[in-house]
Every structure is written in structure tokens, then in C-alpha cells.
């Protein structure tokens, strides 16, 4: 068997998430269906680096899969790309070693979250940015977000009842930008891993800080108390994008860790 790694992007609006599930349209199901056609009707299982939720988008999701023979990677990419549905794009395919695993090999993820703060909201962005109708002071959020950088126990920012025992993660970079022409806030987080709904909970908390309903020090309070009840609401999934995944064998991986 020959193992392939692929970078894919998708519009998550019409998907119930990445991972295959009964009676739902998922990214995994659509790609596996296409691979089956390219593999003479034989099943192919794909593995994803991140399991995005319903409505969540991706520019840089990474998958891997095995095929019984070596193929020209550009022809394979082209075949997959043209036969997958229009809301999935196969950006790049490369052959990798048999022991490569897109989820378990050491990597760094970058997530982006878009918030439309326009009043009125932009209806064209309804599937691609979460609307926040309340006034915010961006400088308050830019100050508060600094407290997320570093190695912390993020229990207070994950979904209640998660089965993951070790909730310590490292965020290498966290920032907020504002595109005034589009009334868009762009939150960017880069780290060695993120807990279930962690990014959406961090954004929900930062928005409450920006609105003045939580103090700038609230991030520190949540990290110390490890209490989800102290954090803000979970921001909607339509504003979330899996932007990039960098593996340890890439030079830029070590640059992030410095």
C-alpha cells in the first residue's frame, strides 16, 4: 500500500462536520466516496488531522489515506478535485512514508475566526462569519488575548463533559485584526492543539470583554479557576476556519516554537 497526504479546503456550510456519521452529509464521506470511484470500487478510509464541527470551514485541513499502488500525485489530486463536490477542494497531494499519521504526528494548527460587527449585518457573510450586534472596544480584546498565549490548562475553555483528560495546551500566537471596510474582526490562534470548542469559547469570552461585560482580567481568572461557567458563550461555528497545519518536519514548525 502507498500512503498519501492531502491538503484540502472546504466550505462547511452544507456539512454536518468532517467526521463520518449516520444519515448526515460529511466531508469524510464525500471524499471517501470519490476515492472509491478512483480505486476501482474498493473502499478507501481517510483520516483527518482535525474533526471540524457542523458549519466550520477549512483552508488547510490535512488528511491521509492508502491506495494499493503508487500514482502520479498531480493526476491523483486533479482526479479527486474534479470529482469531489464543488464545496470541497483538493489543494495538494503528496506521497508520504507508511508511518505518517496526519492526526498523531506532531504538528501545529492555526485557526481563524471571523466576526461581523456591522450594524446592520452583512447577509452575504451569514455562513462565513458570526454576527455580533453589540458595540465592542477592540483595544480591550487585544489586551486580553495576550493572556491566552503560553502553556495553560484550558479546562475553562473547553466544552463541558469532554472526555479528554489532559487539557494542557500551548498557544504560540493569538491576535485580533480589524478590517474596517468589511466590519470584520479576525481572531487568529496558533497552537500545538485545541480542545473541543476551545477556539469558539475563547472568542465568545473575548467578545464579552470587548463589550465591557467582563473585565480584561477575565482570561486569567478562567485559566486559574478552570471553570467553564466563568467563560463567555460559545461562538457559532460558521465563523471558524481551520487555516493551516504545519508538521514537525517543516522548517516553520521550529520557528513557531522559538
From Swiss-Prot:
GO molecular function terms listed in the Swiss-Prot or TrEMBL record: RNA binding; tRNA pseudouridine(38-40) synthase activity
> What is this enzyme's EC?
5.4.99.12
Main enzyme class: isomerase
Keyword Mitochondrion listed: no
Q: Which residues are substrate-binding?
A: 111
NCBIfam families recorded = hisT_truA
The protein's name: tRNA pseudouridine synthase A
Species name? Streptococcus agalactiae serotype III (strain NEM316)
Q: What is the lineage of its organism?
A: Bacteria, Bacillati, Bacillota, Bacilli, Lactobacillales
Amino acid at each position: 500500500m502507498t500512503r498519501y497526504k492531502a491538503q484540502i479546503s472546504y466550505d462547511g456550510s452544507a456539512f454536518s462536520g468532517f467526521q463520518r456519521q449516520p444519515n448526515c452529509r460529511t466531508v469524510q464521506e464525500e471524499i471517501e466516496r470519490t476515492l472509491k470511484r478512483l480505486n476501482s470500487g474498493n473502499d478507501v478510509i481517510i483520516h483527518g488531522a482535525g474533526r471540524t464541527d457542523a458549519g466550520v470551514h477549512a483552508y488547510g485541513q490535512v488528511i491521509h489515506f492508502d491506495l494499493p499502488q503508487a500514482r502520479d500525485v498531480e493526476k491523483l489530486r486533479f482526479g479527486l478535485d474534479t470529482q469531489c463536490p464543488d464545496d470541497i477542494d483538493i489543494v495538494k497531494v503528496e506521497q508520504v512514508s507508511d508511518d505518517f499519521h496526519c492526526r498523531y504526528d506532531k504538528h501545529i494548527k492555526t485557526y481563524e475566526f471571523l466576526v461581523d460587527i456591522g450594524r446592520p449585518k452583512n447577509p452575504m457573510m451569514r455562513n462565513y462569519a458570526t454576527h455580533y450586534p453589540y458595540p465592542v472596544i477592540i483595544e480591550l480584546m487585544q489586551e486580553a488575548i495576550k493572556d491566552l498565549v503560553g502553556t495553560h490548562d484550558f479546562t475553562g475553555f473547553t466544552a463541558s463533559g469532554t472526555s479528554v483528560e489532559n487539557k494542557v495546551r500551548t498557544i504560540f500566537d493569538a491576535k485580533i485584526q480589524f478590517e474596517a471596510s468589511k466590519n470584520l474582526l479576525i481572531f487568529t490562534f496558533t497552537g500545538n492543539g485545541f480542545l473541543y470548542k476551545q477556539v469558539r469559547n475563547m472568542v465568545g469570552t473575548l467578545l464579552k470583554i470587548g463589550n465591557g461585560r467582563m473585565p480584561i482580567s477575565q482570561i486569567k481568572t478562567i485559566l486559574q479557576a478552570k471553570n467553564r461557567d466563568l467563560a463567555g458563550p460559545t461562538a457559532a461555528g460558521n465563523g471558524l476556519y481551520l487555516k493551516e497545519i504545519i508538521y514537525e518536519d517543516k522548517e516553520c514548525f521550529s520557528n513557531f516554537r522559538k
